[in-house]
């Protein structure tokens, strides 16, 4: 098996996986910047009815797009995401000034080789350079 197959096998509790096989794997971390976090939190509340989050430590929000909001609407967006993080116990909330999403995750050690990370943007696969299976652009509603 290649590296990705090994990671997926371990995360799904299988001895091995093969290309084309559908697996249910444990995701180690979900990463979102402020814009996608706003969408995801709204879908979670309004379309999925809220509820509980199994493990808030496996979620990270990084404000790197509108961290210095130019409009009231942008400020409200950040406020909503902050409120959501507090309400659901999400400690990995990085306000503006920490850097871009994926640098923040790497620099704060929120990853380890062999893990699975998902995100909402096309840069998420950068973690592959660190021995992580990472995929982005899966669709904000799917996170």
Feature locations, PLM:
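Fe-S-dependent hydro-lyases/dehydratases of central metabolism
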Residues: 1-142
